Every structure is written in structure tokens, then in C-alpha cells.
From Swiss-Prot:
Gene name for this UniProt entry: POB3
Keyword tRNA-binding: no
Native source species: Cryptococcus neoformans var. neoformans serotype D (strain JEC21 / ATCC MYA-565) (Filobasidiella neoformans)
Chain spans, region Disordered: 185-205, 469-588
Gene Ontology molecular function terms on file: DNA binding; histone binding; nucleosome binding
Pfam families with a match to the protein in the record: PH1_SSRP1-like, POB3_N, Rttp106-like_middle, SSrecog
GO-annotated biological processes: DNA repair; DNA replication-dependent chromatin assembly; DNA-templated DNA replication; nucleosome organization; pericentric heterochromatin formation; positive regulation of RNA polymerase II transcription preinitiation complex assembly; silent mating-type cassette heterochromatin formation; subtelomeric heterochromatin formation
The protein's name: FACT complex subunit POB3
Length: 588
């Protein structure tokens, strides 16, 4: 049996070179690096048509097949001189005529988009600029009034090997947008004459835009809307927080679909790797969180988490569209459900995906609820402590695993009243990644959080001050009199203070009397007695001694008063040198 062989040929999108061999029965391709393996073979009788293209990797032979699973097969790497040889081989062995198709090289981004068979073809002046297999279209959305966005899933058959960079996954296009203005036109009826066109109308009699018609055609041809098999159950009008919108959740045997007014998302069960069921802190709603890998996309935004929300008391009656034989394959499923919506959805997904539903941990906040309120930068959210990690629920949820956490530290930023009531929690990663800082946490949660993390053997660091004096608390007149020493006590008191070493930061109450004496001595260095107003001001400042901001303000105020007294001319000229001398003596 005679054969025809072509060397250095690529099969489809593969980066491996191989050889392509034809014989009267069929043809096959085998990579050079897998000589011991069996080649990929095809039956010659399955070929419907053949096309010759100019592509990036020289020339391409594209074969349309009768097999619905692989409607198109392509081989790249042919030379220009191989055209005649390919024509003779296909004609002789399979009685197939090779069609040569020109490629548009103008580089225009405007033309005509047509659906031909199983391909979306974009033509410029009658020549093909590019074509896209509809089998690779994962989703189609109306991105604007006249825009249609096609999304593509990256190939899942690539395995990344960090030791071999040649086998890394290639760069893939993930989205393509078409701008299609105008209204959709269709051929008019026979009464309007041949060749006439009229505006297409929907069921309600409204005009259909060209973008909507193109979107519907892509969904129909790419089988986006028609998942294989009937849906098992449908949950209508569900509020999805991430990505935000109202969707109907259609559950199938191998995936779920989120169907919205202008956006659809299909999530295979193989993409769901975590399921969380978390009650909100308002005690009125419950959130179902799905961790996705790969994440779903909406425009240029990736969503690695899908967050749905239902009222806590919402009840649903659901009947699964499964036969008794199919139901027997899922022991945890029931034929009918009558319970709260979040319980029914979580139980169905748990049974179909085989994933465990993770509840919140044993930590309770000051109000006895699961979770605490916190901020990440300027984003407010809810932080939940799980048995094996943390999860922060917001527009972009954050999941932290305890096994990858090096330490967690508590700190307080600033010295004002607001910062005294809250603290920050910093999570340091073992892998050297960016730290996660959760701020504006109520200080009442320090104890429960510390106890919970210590039970998980997490290394903790407490960098907060031990005590903070409330600056709003007034001092009584008796306290002012007790804190004001006599003139005879001032010098000896000052000397004793100078002889003492500065202690490490402790509670502000321990240093309050000493700071008052020093302030009084500095302010009364001219030998006079402080006025009544000065005493009142000083006593007020003394109560703020523990606050760094108030301490700085007090020093500035005293400096202004001293400067004002020196420039006012009060006292004789002979007393001024005495001031300096007294100050010098104090310094000594």
C-alpha cells in the first residue's frame, strides 16, 4: 500500500512537530517526541471538504469532518511547494477536491461577520481575515448597546511544569468584541417581492438590534444556551453579589448556569473547588460562596468567587428532574425539597459536586454572631474565622489558609479616640506574598480572636498599647489642687525628677503627677505664680498626657505662652538674666 508523508507538520494548536502520513484508507499524525506511542489516526471516508490557507505557521490544510465531536481538523507547517502534492493525494485517495482560499492581509478591523457551518468567519472585501471555531466559544454577552463580547475558555489539557518552560501553557485570547450597529434585517415575505428586506421584530413586536440578533445566533450555533440534557432544578431570581446582578440558577448534571437579562455564565462542577455557607452579620441573610478555578470572567474582570445571597427565612419547594435510576447515583439527593432556599441550594450542590460545605468556625463576636466587621483598605466587608483559615467577604473576597500563614499581629494606628476603639490585624504569609491587613476591627473582639487563633496554634504578636486614657473624661477641682505643688516643693521636685531615668512606656496614670510638675516649672520659670486660668489649662492638658497628639499640642501651646511672656515686657530687666541662670541651674 503506497503512502505519502509530509515532515515537520503541526497538528492543530500543538507546539510539537511531527509527521503526517496518507494512505488510501485514511491518514495519521505522530509527534517526533512520541515515536513509541500510537499515532492519531482518522478515517479517510469521514472527510467532507478540504481547504488550503496561508497562516502564521506557513500554510495550513484544514479538513472538515463528518464527526460531530471533531468537525474540523487542521495541520500547519506545509510549504508552498506542497500544494500540488496535497491536491493529488486527496483527489487520488479520497476523491476530495482541495479548495484554495485567499486570506485578507489588509489589517482592517471592519468587515462582515458570518457563521459558516461550525465557524465564525470575519471577512474583509470577500476575503477571510480570521475565523473562530464556535466550539471554543464559552460565552456570549451584550457588552453595550451595539457590542457583543465573545469569551473563550483556555485549554485545559496543558499542564504547567516549572522545570520545563517549553511546555508551559501558551498565551490564549480570552475575549473578542464586535461592534454591530443598526437593526437586524431579514428577507421579506413573498408579498413584498423578491430580494426585499424588512426589520426583524421580536415576539412582543419590538425591533431587534443587529447586536441582539448576532448574540442570539452565536448562542444557538455555539450551544451556549443549550446544555446537554435537561436541567435538574432551576432557582429563579437569585441575588448574586459577585458578580452583581439577578440571575436564574439552572443546575445540570455537570454544571450550573447563571442566566441573566444580558449576561450568562456557565460554571462546570470541575471549576468549583470550595463551597462556604456563611450567615451575614445582619442576622437576616445567608451567603453561599463558591470558590472557582479557573474564575469566571465578565469583561476584563476575573471573579474567583461567586457569592449568592438569600433571606434567612425564604422557603422554596423544589422537585428534581431525575429518574429513580439517576437519583440512585447520588445518595445525598432527595426527590423533593421543602426548606429554606440556601439549605436546598447548598445540599444540591454538595451532592452533585462532591465538595464539602464549609460553615463558619466556633468564633463568636461580641454580639454572639459568626464573623466580625472589618475593612481592607477602603473596602468594607465581613471577616469570618473558619476552622482552617479566614475568608473576607466583599466585592472581591479574600481566602487565607492557616497552613500558609506565618503569623498574625494586632496593632493600633494613631492616638485619637477613634483609633483607641479599633485595631488592625495583619496576616503575614509564609510564602513571602503580600500581607493582608484588616483594619477598623472593634477592640472588643481582641479577646475572642486571640483565644481562637491560639487554639489553632497560630503565632500571635500584640503590638497595641497597654492602656489609653479617655481624653473626654473631665478632672475635678480637687484633682487640680492635689496636682498643683507649692513653690517650696518645686525645686526639690524638679531635681528628683531629673535624677530619675525615663521609664519604658506604661500606663499614662503612673507619669501623670510628674508630667504636671515639670510643665508647671517650665511655665513659671519667671518666678511668678500661675494665674487661675493657667492652672485650669494645665490641668486639662495633664489629662491628655497619654495621647501623643495632645502631648505635642500641649508643648506647642506652652512654647507660645513662654514666647508671649518674654516679649510682653513684664518684669524688670534685672530679672531676665536670673531667668537664664535659673534655667541653666535646672539643666545642671
Amino acid at each position: 500500500m503506497s503512502t505519502v508523508t509530509f515532515e515537520n507538520i503541526f497538528h492543530g494548536d500543538s507546539a510539537d512537530l511531527g509527521k503526517l502520513r496518507f494512505n488510501p484508507v485514511g491518514f495519521g499524525w505522530k509527534a517526533y517526541q512520541s515515536e513509541d506511542n500510537n499515532p492519531t489516526t482518522y478515517n479517510g471516508s469521514d472527510i467532507r471538504h478540504a481547504t488550503w490557507f496561508r497562516v502564521a505557521r506557513h500554510f495550513q490544510l484544514r479538513l472538515g469532518m463528518r464527526n460531530s465531536e471533531k468537525p474540523r481538523i487542521s495541520f500547519d507547517g506545509f510549504k508552498r511547494d506542497d500544494l500540488d502534492k496535497i491536491k493529488r493525494t486527496l483527489q487520488e485517495y479520497f476523491n476530495i477536491t482541495l479548495e484554495t482560499r485567499d486570506t485578507s492581509l489588509k489589517g482592517w478591523n471592519w468587515g462582515e461577520a458570518q457563521v459558516k457551518g461550525s465557524d465564525l468567519v470575519f471577512q474583509v472585501q470577500g476575503k477571510t481575515a480570521f475565523d473562530v471555531p464556535l466550539s471554543q466559544v464559552a460565552n456570549s454577552n451584550i457588552a453595550g448597546k451595539y457590542e457583543v463580547a465573545l469569551e473563550f475558555n483556555p485549554p485545559s489539557n496543558y499542564k504547567f511544569d516549572p522545570k520545563d518552560l517549553n511546555k508551559r501553557p501558551p498565551d490564549e485570547m480570552v475575549e473578542m468584541r464586535f461592534y454591530i450597529p443598526g437593526k437586524s434585517m431579514k428577507k421579506a415575505g413573498s408579498d413584498a417581492g423578491s430580494g426585499g428586506e424588512e426589520t426583524e421584530l421580536d415576539e412582543e413586536g419590538n425591533e431587534v438590534s443587529a447586536a441582539d440578533a448576532f448574540h442570539s445566533l452565536i448562542k444557538e450555533k455555539a450551544d451556549i444556551g443549550a446544555v446537554v440534557g435537561d436541567s435538574i432544578v432551576v432557582f429563579e431570581d437569585c441575588l448574586i453579589l459577585t458578580p452583581r446582578g439577578r440571575f436564574s440558577i439552572e443546575v445540570y448534571a455537570d454544571s450550573i448556569r447563571l442566566v441573566g437579562k444580558s449576561t450568562d455564565h456557565r460554571v462546570p462542577f470541575t471549576s468549583i473547588h470550595r463551597i462556604f455557607l456563611l450567615p451575614k452579620l445582619d442576622d437576616l441573610h445567608v451567603q453561599l460562596v463558591l470558590g472557582l478555578d479557573p474564575p469566571i470572567r465578565q469583561g476584563a474582570t476575573r471573579y474567583p468567587f461567586l457569592v449568592a445571597q438569600w433571606p434567612k427565612d425564604e422557603v422554596v419547594n423544589a422537585e428534581l428532574n431525575l429518574t429513580d435510576e439517576e437519583l440512585a447515583q447520588y445518595p445525598d439527593l432527595e426527590k423533593t425539597y421543602e426548606a429554606t432556599t440556601f439549605q436546598v441550594v447548598s445540599r444540591v450542590l454538595k451532592a452533585l459536586t462532591g465538595k464539602k460545605v464549609t460553615p463558619p468556625g466556633s468564633l463568636r463576636n461580641a454580639q454572639g454572631l459568626n464573623g466580625i466587621r472589618a475593612n481592607v483598605k477602603a473596602v468594607q466587608g465581613e471577616l469570618y474565622f473558619l476552622e482552617k483559615g479566614l475568608i473576607f467577604i466583599s466585592k472581591q473576597p479574600i481566602l487565607i489558609d492557616f497552613s500558609k500563614t506565618d503569623s498574625i499581629s494586632f496593632s493600633r494606628v494613631g492616638g485619637g479616640v477613634a483609633s483607641a476603639r479599633t485595631f488592625d490585624m495583619r496576616v503575614v504569609s509564609k510564602t513571602g506574598g503580600a500581607d493582608h491587613v484588616f483594619s477598623a476591627i472593634n477592640k472588643q473582639e481582641v479577646g475572642p480572636i486571640s483565644s481562637f487563633l491560639q487554639s489553632k496554634n497560630i503565632r500571635l504578636k500584640n503590638e497595641m498599647e497597654e492602656a489609653i486614657v479617655d481624653i473626654d473624661e473631665p478632672f475635678s477641682d480637687d484633682d487640680e489642687e492635689m496636682e498643683s505643688p507649692s513653690e517650696d516643693e518645686r525645686p526639690s521636685k524638679a531635681k528628683n525628677d531629673k535624677s530619675k531615668t525615663k521609664p519604658v512606656k506604661k500606663a499614662a496614670d503612673d507619669d501623670e503627677d510628674e508630667s504636671d510638675d515639670e510643665d508647671f516649672e517650665d511655665e513659671s520659670s519667671d518666678g511668678g505664680s500661675p494665674s487661675e486660668s493657667d492652672s485650669d489649662d494645665d490641668s486639662g492638658m495633664a489629662s491628655d498626657a497619654s495621647d501623643p497628639m495632645m502631648e505635642e499640642l500641649r508643648k506647642k501651646t506652652q512654647a507660645k505662652r513662654t514666647k508671649a511672656k518674654e516679649t510682653s515686657g513684664s518684669g524688670s530687666e534685672d530679672e531676665k538674666p536670673k531667668k537664664k541662670k535659673a534655667k541653666k541651674d535646672d539643666d545642671e
